């Protein structure tokens, strides 16, 4: 990643890959991201920041998810924590809804940026439910501080109409291909859209961002537009956090 030109990583809280058995597994994971992953990234001259949350995929176990949310509070003031996220929906149910709203409340109380996860199925329902929750929480006036991730062709216009930042996850097999992401950019412009990648439990490619930059160059996009969607839009979003200190 360093050799490919990546300078900064913002890592959101993910799910464990298998069912969690105790609050301690959340604590270990959060500390691992804050401490070990930051140190590891910096050894390769990459700055590293963290978004903290109980991930939507792990938000339905009771009382575990609520206990984890209580435990999360002591980590939020750590210097590398720049946002609450990912939060939102996986299966779209009332248990996920409860954790989503509680974590939105935390973001407001702590004046933190928010990263929202759209479900991988029923995305239209997911964006509509997300809009409804944001409206009920009186957050439609704060959408410049909200990133909605995992957009597709059927959600991106609604995300941008809300005034939120729109994440496009380029990921082999299950999410967007580079060409799908580029087609969405051609249709919707480059403002408030950011390309991101993943390195998780499935087939993934942490070099998806420079890959998209290369493919955009082949298609004749300007240097400015390429840099906006692969770097500067994300930079503009995250620098709203006082703890995001990296500068070009």
List each language-model region with its residue ranges.
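Short, acidic/turn-prone active-site loops that include or flank metal/cofactor-
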Residues: 13-16, 170-175, 199-200
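Short acidic active-site motifs
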Residues: 154-156, 177-180
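Short active-site-adjacent structural elements
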Residues: 175, 202-206, 238-239
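Short acidic/histidine-rich active-site segments
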Residues: 190-206
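Mid-to-C-terminal alpha-helical segments outside catalytic/metal-binding sites
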Residues: 210-248
